[in-house]
Amino acid sequence: MPTQEEIYKTEGDKYEALIAREDHQGNILRALREITPLENRVVYDLGAGTGRLACMLAPHVRHVRAFDISEEMLRVCREKFTASGLSNWQADVADHRQLPVEDASADLVVSGWSVAYLAVWNPDSWRSELEKWLGEMKRVLRPNSYIVLFESLGTGNELPIKLEHLRDYYPWLDQVGFQNKVIRTDYKFDSLDEAEYLSRFFFGDELGDKVKKNNWGILPECTGVWWKQI
């Protein structure tokens, strides 16, 4: 089975098939609106992947720029933007810690299930990598703007849990001044077969088996929302 890192590099279409099923109740957009207005905002989406957040936000904001280190993910993102008929978007390969943008050029930075990888993929230097990222956010955001992060608190869980591989990341967010709350972002699939197949593809056999055992056409997921004003 491919790792998640390998999936991001090579499996854009299959990954999008999964992500398109997420948050069937629309809680992500609702949570964002509770934190900050969206209208007339310039938004940067970091680790945008296939455009889960960027494509959702584009109809509501002035301009959105999607950044990701994977050209494969951005290929799908661009296809979705083009199909939408919208023109207020741009998608570019870039690292969270070094964005190809001017100082004080955005009103909102969002990132879904992505900034955490700076900690996960850099176990020996996770704190300094996160500090580099936060410094870059302070550079690119206008005064009194917001960073909003969405991170996992358990897929296949009805109640939120702290994931072991993010044990350093969660308290770091608290230490640097992020507020947080919990939302549900459940996946709603077209069939039980699809639910099992896509869950197994990305999350692994343990969750795939759980979906099959519980006959989950709707896969529960808890997501943490962290936000900070700059």
Predicted regions, residues:
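Residues that mark the start of a beta-strand
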Residues: R41-V42, R142
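Conserved Class I S-adenosyl-L-methionine
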Residues: T50, K181-I230
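Conserved class I S-adenosyl-L-methionine
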Residues: M1-E39, Y146-P171
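A short glycine-rich, Lys/Arg-flanked "PGG" loop and its adjoining helix->strand segment in the class I
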Residues: R127-P143
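Class I SAM-dependent methyltransferase SAM/SAH-binding core
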Residues: Y44-L46, T50-Q98
